[in-house]
Amino acid sequence: LCAEAARRGVRIVGTGVYVSDNPQEWERMFQLAHEMKMEYITCEPPLDLWDQVESLSRKYGIKVSVHNHPQPSDYWKPENLLEAIKGRSRDLGSCSDVGHWNREGLQQMDCLRMLNKRIISLHFKDIAPKQEGKQWQEDVIWGTGCLDVKGMLSVLKEQGFKGYFAIEYENNWDNSVPDIVKCIEYFNQAAEEILR
């Protein structure tokens, strides 16, 4: 896989979202990430395995980027993650899914600010506004939804964010590439404006 990725000019920097309560599986996950020369794994460690996960992170030189799936995930809000990693290595941090925060009634700007310097990667997106009678807010083309993509990018710039963006677009499954291209175009335009 690494050879094929390299042949195509692609560098695989991370994997996930990894979830397991089996300590041996965590060792194998870190081994895989190390063998593939990845920088981080995206995961949701059980609260009672943090000592092992931190130890494996140090052993293999792999960062841990914790995803915030909606409730009942232990990490659905930033305070929970910050409590779990308090006093631990700076290589343990957040894979901030900005859409899930909003879907849970949290303000994504506040969450990004709260996690200052502990964000390793992002599942970045824009989502449709809440609609009466609908529980789920669909992913939409960046800049057309309710998340203030440009504002989030400004917060990340203020924080000196140096991690990774994963474009997460879980909509229009049969023809999503044109929508993703529009997301990239919006990102480039917004980033250019912010950097002026």
Spans of model-derived segments:
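Active-site acidic/histidine proton-transfer and metal-coordination neighborhood
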Residues: E4, R8-S94, N102-G105, M114
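Histidine-acidic metal/acid-base catalytic patches
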Residues: P23, H34, P78, L82-S96, ...
